[in-house]
From Swiss-Prot:
Name of the molecule in the record: Glutamyl-tRNA reductase
Classification via InterPro entries: 4pyrrol_synth_GluRdtase, 4pyrrol_synth_GluRdtase_dimer, 4pyrrol_synth_GluRdtase_N, GluRdtase_CS, GluRdtase_dimer_dom_sf, GluRdtase_N_sf, NAD(P)-bd_dom_sf, Shikm_DH/Glu-tRNA_Rdtase
Annotated source species: Solidesulfovibrio magneticus (strain ATCC 700980 / DSM 13731 / RS-1) (Desulfovibrio magneticus)
Its job: Catalyzes the NADPH-dependent reduction of glutamyl-tRNA(Glu) to glutamate 1-semialdehyde (GSA).
EC number of the protein: 1.2.1.70
Length: 453
């Protein structure tokens, strides 16, 4: 049965941070397993959940529309009403879904154009889908192709030439607030990948010291050691806030970790010297009410857009070149998908050819009598099957070429009728139920799943 690729998602373009918080699924979402094993019963599923997007990739038979089932399961996992999700959702299917995924993997759909973090996040989502056994033939091939396309884009264009990321944008915004960064102190709350990037950019910008707080103290020590900073016990970081000018928080906690009342006390201890807070976590780490305090500047992910726009100019030209690369690779992946439709016909054709060869061989052996040596019988069988294979070579090569065209299904249908491949198969002799050699595995000519670069 022909399969279709569907992609449903929301991102920073379609939904504000509040909506993304409500429908975030975490790093190891169970939604994929629920979609495959639950009521939806889709064939394959992969879920990508980051600060700026949640996307659900599914494979299901053509003719079935899994959208309602996906929305219901997704909203149910978050304890939300599907009606709240629908207005912010985008949906793609077929090659439009493939094109979107390739753009995401290449960083063309990111808040910061060309940022490389999303590729690592997609790889993690794929590993989770494989471990959960929700990735099948199509998602396996699609993800590996996406990884390959992202590599091509990064090496063939200059889209990733400069160090631009959410963390970089956060540091750029801090430089706008304070001007000179020399002598400023910063604290990172959370020690994940985003914090690591922030530490690198902070150090480059000239801050004098970096404090790192994390629930796992060993990880805080590790990150602090790499950037000549100091580790802080997570339970103590609030009491140390008065020491720093800049706070970048990215814990991934399900609740606020920096409260407005704590910041009021910190400001008093600092004699109301300005403080700059960047909240790059979803759900948010920092109480939005602190924005009402004097001498406090609070920005979340959505506020970074203005800074990000200034870093896009040099990448937009490269993005056009990247689109050309992606367009070609989408076309090639489409050819591979079409080859899946023709594969059963090729297998049936090879089966019929091998069956006829064996039937004629049996007639010949009966005429020759029982005295024919087994070695001769084996040689005759090899010859008969080889002739069958060679006779079918050109028809199969023709069918593979034509199947990739716009109306390729017509050639598949014509071949099935021409060779009567849909007739009821009835064994005609003792050898009729023997499995024929798998020519598709023994010859590149019959590699019906080829989708080479």
């Amino acid at each position: 049965m022909e399969q279709q690729i569907y992609l449903f998602g929301l991102n920073h373009k379609t939904a504000g941070v509040e909506v993304r918080e409500a429908f975030a699924l975490g790093e190891r979402p169970k939604l994929g397993e629920l979609l495959v094993d639950g009521e939806a019963r889709v064939r394959e599923a992969l879920v990508l959940s980051t600060c700026n997007r949640v996307e659900v990739l599914v494979v299901d038979p053509v003719g079935r529309d899994p959208k309602a089932a996906v929305l219901a399961a997704w909203a149910g996992q978050c304890g939300q009403d599907p009606a709240l999700l629908a207005p912010h959702l985008y949906a793609h299917q077929g090659m439009a879904a493939v094109d979107h995924l390739f753009c995401v993997a290449s960083g063309l759909d990111s808040l910061v154009l060309g940022e490389p973090q999303i590729l690592g996040q997609l790889k993690a989502a794929y590993r989770h889908a494989v471990a959960s056994r929700t990735a099948g033939v199509i998602i396996n091939r699609l993800c590996h192709k996406a990884f390959s396309v992202a590599k091509k884009v990064r090496t063939a264009t200059g889209i990733g030439a400069s160090a631009v990321s959410i963390s970089y944008a956060a540091v750029e915004l801090a430089k706008r607030i304070f001007g000179e960064m020399a002598g400023k102190k910063a604290m990172l709350v959370g020690a994940g990948e985003m914090a690591e990037l922030a530490a690198m950019h902070l150090l480059t910008s000239g801050v004098s010291e970096i404090l790192v707080a994390n629930r796992t103290y060993a990880r805080a020590e590790e990150l602090a050691g790499r950037f000549k900073g100091r580790a802080v016990a997570f339970e103590e970081f609030v009491s140390r806030l008065h020491e720093v000018d800049i706070v970048i928080s990215s814990t991934g906690a399900p609740h606020v970790v920096i409260r407005a009342k704590d910041v009021r006390a910190v400001l008093k201890a600092r004699r109301h010297k300005p403080m700059f807070f960047i909240d790059i976590a979803v759900p948010r780490d920092i109480d939005p009410d602190i924005n009402s305090l004097d001498n406090v500047y609070l920005y979340d992910i959505d506020d970074l857009q203005e800074v990000v726009e200034e870093n896009l100019a040099q990448r937009r030209e490269e993005a056009a070149r990247a689109r050309d690369i992606i367009g070609l690779q989408v076309e090639r992946f489409g050819e591979w998908v079409k080859s899946l439709d023709v594969k059963p016909t090729i297998v049936d054709l090879l089966d019929v050819g091998a069956s006829l060869a064996r039937q004629e061989l049996q007639k010949t052996l009966r005429r020759l009598g029982p005295e024919v040596p087994e070695e001769t019988r084996a040689a005759l069988e090899t010859m008969a099957l080889s002739i069958s294979r060679k006779m079918l070579h050109e028809p199969i090569a023709f069918l593979k070429r034509r199947a990739k065209e716009e109306h390729g299904e017509r050639f598949v249908d014509l071949t099935r009728r021409m060779y009567n491949l849909d007739r009821e198969k009835v064994p005609t002799d003792a050898h009729a139920d023997r499995k024929p050699p798998n020519f598709a595995e023994t010859s590149d000519d019959f590699d019906v799943t080829d989708a080479s670069e």
